[in-house]
Regions:
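The feature captures the beta-strand-to-loop junction immediately N-terminal to the Walker
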Residues: 38-40
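Conserved ABC transporter NBD signature motif
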Residues: 61-68, 229-231
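H-loop/switch region of ABC-family ATPase nucleotide-binding domains
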Residues: 206-207
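Helix-to-loop junction immediately C-terminal to a conserved catalytic motif
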Residues: 53
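ABC ATPase C-loop
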Residues: 162-163
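ABC ATPase NBD coupling module
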Residues: 15, 69-83, 91, 113-116, ...
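Conserved beta-strand-loop-alpha-helix hinge in the C-terminal portion
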Residues: 226-252
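A short, flexible loop at the N-terminus of ABC-type nucleotide-binding domains that lies
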Residues: 1, 10-24, 74
Length: 264
């Protein structure tokens, strides 16, 4: 479903600020894989997701989604294959528009659009049923402005919008990091439910090692732009946070310096 082949990306090449973010990265995801991604600051996690999404061109290598080489496609062109949820709940929705208008825009992604958003009765009923699955009461607030929603409600709506067309690949970029623990748990549980029910191939960056172990069928750890640990199946299920810390120290030769990841 997704192949990252020998991908490298360096920022500010040839300057004193030169930084190699991805260093010959190789990764293959099978259809339906739910991969959690961990690593310290600057490990290349978000750069990897941005490279896959086409936010910036890679220096070398190939990116293939569902058998299509998308390496030279723009971010807009890749949007037909990808759904994405960012860390900031304000990203991915239009605050001044109604909930149903946001859903209509998401439903028509990749299709011809007009300046006017006309929503049929059938579409409105479909949106109501989708929102009901969130169990947040939003199905009764279709005409509410999105800017009035809480961070958790808005992130849940963004998740719904990113997945309603069943993308080939779902990218979750620390999408619960800005939420309080109780709300984060609800959004994570909802994410896992949507991924499983729709059999979505997913990559989820998380700062929480416990969540990385709990969710998904596979876990990868990144360091200095490449993958240093890749585990799945029963071995992943039996992992402890202490195991991940030990693996990091062995593979990288250093201590894990992100207390937020260790203590979460």
């Amino acid at each position: 479903m997704l192949e990252i082949q020998n991908v490298s990306k360096t920022f500010n090449a040839g300057t004193v600020n030169e930084k190699t973010a991805l260093n010959g990265l190789n990764l293959k995801l099978n259809e339906g894989d739910f991969v959690t991604v961990i690593g310290g600051n600057g490990a290349g996690k978000s750069t990897m997701l941005n490279a896959v999404a086409g936010v910036w061109p890679v220096d070398c290598g190939k990116i293939i989604i569902d058998g299509v080489d998308v390496t030279r496609l723009s971010e807009h062109q890749r949007a037909a294959y990808i759904g994405r949820v960012f860390q900031d709940p304000k990203t991915g929705t239009a605050a001044t528009m109604q909930i149903e208008e946001n859903l209509a825009l998401a439903a028509r992604r990749g299709k011809p659009r007009t300046l006017r958003i006309g929503i049929t009765r059938a579409e409105r009923e479909q949106y109501r049923e989708l929102l009901k699955s969130l169990d947040l009461g939003l199905e009764n607030r279709l005409t509410a402005r999105v800017g009035l929603l809480s961070g958790g409600q808005r992130q849940a709506l963004t998740l719904l919008m990113a997945t309603m067309n069943k993308p080939k690949l779902l990218l979750l970029d620390e999408h619960t990091a800005a939420l309080d623990p109780k709300t984060a748990l609800k959004v994570l549980t909802l994410s896992a439910k949507i991924v499983e029910e729709n059999h979505l191939t997913t990559m989820m960056i998380t700062h929480n090692m416990k969540d990385a172990i709990k969710y998904g069928n596979r876990l990868i750890m990144m360091h200095e732009g490449h993958i240093i640990y890749d585990v799945s199946g029963e071995e992943k299920k039996n992992l402890q946070v202490s195991d991940l810390l030990a693996k990091f120290q062995i593979a990288s030769g250093g201590e894990f310096a992100n207390d937020r990841m260790i203590l979460s």
